Design a protein with these regions (language model features):
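Catalytic phosphate/metal-binding cores of nucleic-acid and nucleotide-processing enzymes, i.e., regions
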Residues: 1, 11-14, 33, 66-72, ...
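Conserved N-terminal alpha-helix of the aminotransferase class I/II PLP-enzyme fold
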Residues: 1-23, 27
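Conserved PLP-anchoring active-site segment centered on the Schiff-base-forming lysine
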Residues: 12-16, 28-47, 62
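Short acidic, S/G/P-rich loop/turn micro-motifs used as interaction or catalytic elements
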Residues: 24, 44-46, 78-85, 109-112, ...
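Short, charged, surface-exposed secondary-structure boundary motifs
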Residues: 47-50, 68-69, 137-142
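Active-site phosphate-binding strand-loop segment of PLP-dependent enzymes
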Residues: 57-111
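A short alpha/beta connector and helix-capping loop motif
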Residues: 115-130
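Conserved core segment of the aminotransferase class I/II
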Residues: 127-177
Length: 177
């Protein structure tokens, strides 16, 4: 976006169309279902629901107990509870770098936020996801994108490689931007 400085975004070269950000979340949770999920208090309710349903006794709030190897972090930015950069964003990412904890950044609202600078170059950030439904009135078209630093095969890749995706929504998204 114009006026935005997101250092490191160009490192995310593997792009997949997704049915909104939610499909990206689900694929991430499937990949990391054996890990302990870590969220900030006030995180988007979908992540809290997945913590309860999918991770059960493998979940802790960030800040209640230290991050550890074997954890996985999902964090919205802008943060779901405040609309700003999450508290301790850079220090959480630095700790995730140190411990090799994979991070998914939910950036669904970045296009309408006042956040102009972010450091996305942290190696722990494996996936960034966003959608067009916050900027344009297309919430029922499920126009999302998953951006990954490294290629990893999964069903979303298979859908995209074989063009087994909602082409109407993809074309609408291209037209909107």
């Amino acid at each position: 976006s114009k006026g935005k400085n997101f250092k490191g975004y160009q490192e995310f070269k593997h792009l997949d169309f997704s049915n909104g950000t939610t499909e990206t979340f689900d694929k991430f949770y499937q990949t990391h279902h054996g890990h302990r999920l870590r969220l900030l208090k006030g995180e988007y309710f979908y992540h809290q629901l997945q913590a309860k349903l999918m991770f059960k006794n493998r979940f802790d709030w960030i800040g209640d107990v230290p991050l550890a190897e074997g954890d996985v972090v999902v964090m919205s930015c802008p943060f779901s509870d405040t609309g700003g950069v999450p508290v301790d964003f850079d220090s959480i990412l630095a700790e995730c770098d140190r411990l090799s904890v994979p991070v998914l950044l939910d950036m669904a609202y970045i296009s309408i936020s006042s956040i102009n600078e972010l450091d996305l170059s942290h190696p722990c950030i494996k996936i960034i996801t966003s959608s067009l439904s916050k900027v344009f009135p297309v919430e029922h078209h499920r126009i999302g994108i998953r951006m990954r630093r490294e290629f990893e095969d999964d069903t979303l890749v298979a859908y995209n490689q074989t063009k087994y995706i909602n082409r109407y929504s993809v074309n609408l998204g291209h037209h909107m931007i």
